[in-house]
Regions:
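Gly/Ser-rich "nucleophile elbow"/oxyanion-hole loop immediately N-terminal to the catalytic nucleophile
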Residues: 5-14, 84-106, 123-128
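Accessory cap/linker subdomain of secreted extracellular hydrolases
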Residues: 136-168
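Short, surface-exposed "cap/lid" segments of acyl-processing enzymes
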Residues: 4-49
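Short beta-to-alpha linker loops that shape the active-site pocket of alpha/beta-hydrolase fold enzymes
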Residues: 24, 51, 56-60
């Protein structure tokens, strides 16, 4: 499942498409497709005239099971599927896209952005061309820096994070 944010004002021409990857969330109900979850960055991009998609990652939203936290293949697939759905929705509503595709994400979304960018450029070049990508503050080194940080501070401020990491 995913969330689509249409531009917030009438367009004078074709629109760029941006895929916003959300940060780490511990609850299925906080996934972008769920009512009231809202993604501020999706709204910001839409207010500037972008068509916006925000993917739920597998295990979040309405999908069964646990989230495969920082599992690059499943994260990338979620983004590709959301992009396809967004393009299809635009086409069926007479919204023309201009061919520009932007990817961005923060926290887990940074990791997802890197995974999606790699997949788009290696497996989907006939379908998508990434214009620019901004993966921000992602957990890129789970086996090193992230684990070291979790274990070195006895007062780790996010105790909910460790079970997500172990379950993944």
């Amino acid at each position: 499942s995913s969330h689509f944010e249409p531009p917030q004002y009438p367009s004078n021409g074709p629109l760029p498409l941006v895929s916003v990857q959300h940060g780490t969330t511990a609850r299925k109900s906080d996934a972008p497709s769920q009512p009231g979850s809202g993604d501020i960055w999706a709204s910001v991009f839409a207010s500037y005239g972008y068509a916006v998609v925000v993917a739920d990652y597998l295990g979040l939203g309405s999908s069964p099971g646990y989230q495969a936290y920082c599992h690059a293949p499943s994260e990338a697939t979620s983004v590709v599927d959301a992009l396809r759905a967004g393009k299809s929705l635009c086409a069926s509503n007479n919204v023309t896209l201009n061919g520009q595709l932007f990817l961005t994400g923060y926290s887990q979304g940074g990791h997802v952005t890197m995974a999606a960018h790699r997949e788009l450029e290696t497996l989907h070049t006939n379908e998508f061309t990434v214009t620019a990508s901004a993966p921000c503050a992602g957990p890129y080194d789970l086996g090193g820096v992230t684990i070291q940080s979790l274990l070195s501070d006895p007062a780790y401020p996010n105790p909910w994070y460790f079970p997500i990491l172990l379950a993944a």
